[in-house]
Amino acid sequence: LSYGFVNDYTGPSGHQDYFTTMPSLLAKVAQSDKIDEYKVEPEVKALFEKGDFGQYKDGKSGEMQLCFLTNNDITGGNSGSPMFNGKGELIGLAFDGNWDAMSSDISFTQDLTRCIGVDIRYVLYVIDQWGHADRLIREVGL
C-alpha cells in the first residue's frame, strides 16, 4: 500500500503540471512523421480531434485529462495498480514513474519521485468511444 498526493513536479528535468491533456497528446501525434512512437491509427486521431469528451472531461478544468502525477512510491510490478482518492473512489491506474523515480527502490525522495497514473476517465472514454464496449460501460454504471 502506498499513499500520496496529486501534484506538479519540478526537478532537474524541468517543471511538469500535474496532468496532461488531449492537446498535448495531439501535439505529439503531429510529430509522428518523425517519431514512430507517436503514430496512432487514423480513426483514433479523428476521434481525439473531434473533442467530444462528454461525461469524461474534468468538471473543473473542462479538459480531457489523460495522465496525472502523484508523489506515491512505485516500484516494478505496480503497473496497473488502482489509484484511489481520499474518498475511496477509483481515479486512475499506476503505470510508470518519472526519470527521477528510477532510484526510488533504493532511496525514495518525495520531492523528486513521481508516480504516473492514467486517469480512469480517459480509460473509460477509450473503452466507450473507440472500443464501443457498451456492455462494459453499462456494467460500471455509466
Which stretches of residues belong to each language-model region?
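Serine endopeptidase catalytic core focused on the charge-relay Asp
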Residues: L1-G77, F84-L142
